[in-house]
């Protein structure tokens, strides 16, 4: 899926900013683990709530957890176990871009997802 044909960064950013929600799904793709790549024949698939992912980049590198929320408007996902500690001791979820995670286990209740991934 191509949001724009331009190479200019400003137009790329604008296309992402103005993209409709139904096109943002493909931008929210994450790399698959080796086992899932062999099983589905794809390198990446969109992240869904319930998937188990491993963080590959950033200060939370190495943490594995379940996706509890997918924010299409902000292009971020919330992973259980990836939290910021506030000054008063409370923990707040830390949003991560899907390109910085790897899907290790997929949530399997959606049959359409597997039909499209087996093409």
From Swiss-Prot:
Q: What is the lineage of its organism?
A: Archaea, Methanobacteriati, Methanobacteriota, Methanomada group, Methanococci
- Which keywords accompany this UniProt record? Ribonucleoprotein, Ribosomal protein, RNA-binding, rRNA-binding
Which family is it part of?
Belongs to the universal ribosomal protein uL24 family.
The record's listing under Pfam families reads: KOW, Ribosomal_L26
Q: Which GO terms describe its biological process?
A: translation
Which cysteines are disulphide-bonded? none
Q: Does the keyword Methyltransferase apply?
A: no
A GO molecular function assigned to this protein is:
rRNA binding
Query: Which purpose does this protein serve, as stated in its record?
Result: One of two assembly initiator proteins, it binds directly to the 5'-end of the 23S rRNA, where it nucleates assembly of the 50S subunit.
Ranges that cross the membrane: none
Quaternary structure and partners: Part of the 50S ribosomal subunit.
Q: Which organism is it from?
A: Methanococcus vannielii (strain ATCC 35089 / DSM 1224 / JCM 13029 / OCM 148 / SB)
| Top-level division of the source organism's lineage | Archaea
Q: Name one GO cellular component term.
A: large ribosomal subunit
Question: What name has this protein been given in UniProt?
Answer: Large ribosomal subunit protein uL24
Cite the InterPro entries for this sequence.
Answer: KOW, Rib_uL2_dom2, Ribosomal_uL24_CS, Ribosomal_uL24_euk/arc, Ribosomal_uL24_KOW, Translation_prot_SH3-like_sf
